[in-house]
């Protein structure tokens, strides 16, 4: 009987030791995975960006932003996603459905249709914002993926220099 108790105790301790060893290995793997492939955080268009935004000066600019799309009367995109840089600024990414042709006209068959583009906004309030479309001499006009657009179309890369000051209508 004594031998059976010792064997049972020894078996229990071995199982317990294996449990702790396996548990430690799993925790280490999860920690490494969490820090290695940190995903970009794209969100749906927030409610305070949705609406029609206008500038009325020498010319009228109008931008319409919905949960899924962005248009300025010339180019249009859907699958809209936002990457916030803070509470008042960020980037709106769209997949072109209407883009510029080589002759500066806009159409649904332009080469960039289906590709990704970005617009930067800053100083967002409930009724105003500053908006700039991505442009850089000798820069890209669109990218194949949203991740490429996020890496390419940035303030630091020189794509956003002129901002329109807009009011919500």
Regions found by a protein language model. Give the residues of each.
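Sec-dependent N-terminal signal peptides
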Residues: 10-20
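Bacterial N-terminal signal peptides that target proteins for export
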Residues: 2-11
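Contiguous, well-ordered beta-strand patches that form the walls/edges
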Residues: 56-62, 75-150
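Short, low-complexity, Pro/Ser/Thr/Gly-rich segments in the mature regions of secreted, periplasmic
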Residues: 160-169
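Bacterial Sec-dependent N-terminal signal peptides
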Residues: 3, 18-48, 169
């Amino acid at each position: 009987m004594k031998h059976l108790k010792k064997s049972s105790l020894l078996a229990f301790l071995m199982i317990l030791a294996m449990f702790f060893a396996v548990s430690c290995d799993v925790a280490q793997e999860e920690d490494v995975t969490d820090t290695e492939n940190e995903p970009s955080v794209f969100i749906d268009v927030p409610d305070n960006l949705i609406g029609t935004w206008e500038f009325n000066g020498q010319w009228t600019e109008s931008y319409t932003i919905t949960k899924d799309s962005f248009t300025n009367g010339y180019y249009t995109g859907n699958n809209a996603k936002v990457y916030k840089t803070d509470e008042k600024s960020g980037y709106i990414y769209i997949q072109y459905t209407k883009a510029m042709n080589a002759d500066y006209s806009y159409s649904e068959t332009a080469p960039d249709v289906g590709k990704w583009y970005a617009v930067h906004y800053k100083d967002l309030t409930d009724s105003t914002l500053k908006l700039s479309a991505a442009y850089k001499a000798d820069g890209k006009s669109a990218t194949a993926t949203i991740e490429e657009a996020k890496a390419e179309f940035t303030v630091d890369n020189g794509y956003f220099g002129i901002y329109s000051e807009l009011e919500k209508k």
